[in-house]
C-alpha cells in the first residue's frame, strides 16, 4: 500500500475466519486474504477480488515471481532422529502432490469433507501450486529470501533468516 501512495491506512491483524464477516458487517473497508477466503467472499456476493498475486507484485517487485505462502514442514529433530521415516513421509507426500497435479478435478472432491472448504465452492477455489523441496530453482529461493527479508527489514525478525538453510534436502 505504501508503494502506491496509501500512507494513511490502519492495518490491523484479523483472524482469517473474520475477513469476510467483517467486510459484510462494514467493520473494515478492505482485506488482504488468502484462498479460499477470497473465493468464499466472491461466491457469497459479499466481496470482489481486486487483484491476485499481490505479494509477488508489490513485495517481491515481480508480478511473475512465485510466492510460497505455506509449507509442508517436518520438525528438524525428527529429520535427525528418524531420517528413514521422514524419507517415507516425504515420498508419500510427493506422491500426493503428483496426484493433485495430474488429477486436479478428482483432487477437488477431497476438499469437501477433508478441509473447511464447502462443497458449493470446491470447483471455484484455486488449487495450490505445490513445489517440492527438490524442485526449487535458485530464483525461487531468491524470491523466498526476499520475502523473509521484509520481516527482518521491518524488525519483525530480530536477525536475518537464511531461507535456503530451512529447506529440506533429503
What positions do the PLM features span?
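Short beta-strand-to-loop elements that line the ligand-binding cleft
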Residues: 8-15
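Short helix-capping segments at alpha-helix termini
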Residues: 2-7, 156
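Hinge/cleft segment of the Venus flytrap/periplasmic-binding protein
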Residues: 160-170
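Secondary-structure end/capping motifs
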Residues: 79-158
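Residue-level "edge-of-site" marker
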Residues: 14, 36, 54, 125, ...
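Pocket-lining segment of extracytoplasmic ligand-binding domains
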Residues: 18-111
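Residue-level marker of alpha-helix boundaries and capping positions
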Residues: 10, 28-29, 138
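A generic structural signal for alpha->beta connector loops
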Residues: 6-8, 46-47
Amino acid at each position: 500500500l505504501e508503494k502506491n501512495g496509501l500512507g494513511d491506512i490502519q492495518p490491523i491483524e484479523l483472524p482469517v475466519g473474520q475477513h469476510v464477516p467483517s467486510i459484510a458487517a462494514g467493520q473494515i473497508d478492505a482485506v488482504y486474504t488468502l484462498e479460499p477466503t477470497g473465493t468464499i467472499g466472491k461466491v457469497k456476493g459479499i466481496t470482489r477480488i481486486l487483484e491476485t498475486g499481490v505479494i509477488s507484485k508489490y513485495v517481491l517487485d515481480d508480478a511473475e515471481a512465485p510466492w510460497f505462502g505455506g509449507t509442508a514442514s517436518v520438525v528438524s529433530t525428527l529429520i535427525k532422529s528418524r531420517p528413514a521415516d521422514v524419507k517415507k513421509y516425504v515420498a508419500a507426500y510427493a506422491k500426493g502432490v503428483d496426484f493433485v497435479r495430474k488429477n486436479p478435478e478428482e483432487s477437488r472432491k477431497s476438499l469437501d469433507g477433508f478441509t473447511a472448504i464447502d462443497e458449493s465452492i470446491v470447483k471455484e477455489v484455486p488449487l495450490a501450486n505445490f513445489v517440492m523441496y527438490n524442485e526449487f530453482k535458485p530464483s525461487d529461493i531468491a524470491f523466498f529470501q526476499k520475502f523473509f527479508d521484509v520481516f527482518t527489514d521491518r524488525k519483525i525478525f530480530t536477525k536475518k533468516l537464511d531461507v535456503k538453510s530451512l529447506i529440506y534436502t533429503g
